[in-house]
């Protein structure tokens, strides 16, 4: 949504925020559930040798654009979520995203134990047990929150496997109303949509049966099934006692529609989930795709908005996906487009120079190195941006597999090229942090100084500067 709300880490959170903004613009009947993290994702700084340093800064909720949700007594609403043999108590907050309400759960309160207060401390924080507790709060607690608010929707969207347990609670609710399990799961499937974002098995959450049973052991009886039946809903191979419970498999088994986030990712997802539906070819499954989009007003620079307003149809903002409207770009002169392009590029380069000066002052680095680096940043070079989480499967290192060839490319006197890198590695991901350190080490070599640049603390503000200023993203 915005960098002031530290409730996201990468593209998944940014995309979810854009969903809500676009839904508001379209006046869709939609609401959303998430977490109000006390610390959010970390602030990244880099040591002199390129080592990532993760800093966690507590958010002051009183200074954020959020409202307390009040109950009928005028007190802050509390949702009680069953865990094992006790309850976790979550405050409910609301963010008004235009016309859309985003409800955020917060367990950092005195009603909970120290361990349960930390459930909503950090995004992707803690061990696998804390991860499971987070997913129970999001899924089961999310549905309980909607019930307490009196909100009932026709379609429930599970955005990644983290929220898959919404369908456990929904089945429990239908069974409590008198339906059989078979009737309940059909109703749940018919009204559930699951979006998968990751292209690799390592990106899905798997939980050992012992840990999963520690917190979920009481739910099968409420669903009208056995424990083994519940476990099998999360297994590629039902009946395999050695297989762990996968949230993504459970989401596939309890959703009528499953989609990837691009045409190619849809195909990859069909192959990835093919083993769930035995006897069917991958292309026969109900896994499709919906290509990721962005909220145009959020990511379009002011300079480009002025150009569109001057040359495009007055209804442009209300029909951005209409290809006919975009044909007006051919009526804009090359000079005007290039002038706008260079204004944005120079803004980005000025920002990069400012950031490097501040980093040098902070780290008390070699002044000759920073002067040399700033001198070598060339506004006329082709500027390529790379910004994403530094997980190893995202392959940030591919550019550096042939350094001699890369040196020739970036130092070509006629067609110079520069690369801007930015991104955070998970604090527990040593390999991802190693990639960052390796890129910084390479960027300090004489042949790459000012040609390979790494910017610290990737967030939405930096992302907006990059996407508007680079030549290739």
Predicted regions span which residues?
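Catalytic cores of carbohydrate-active enzymes across secretory and cytosolic contexts
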Residues: 1-473
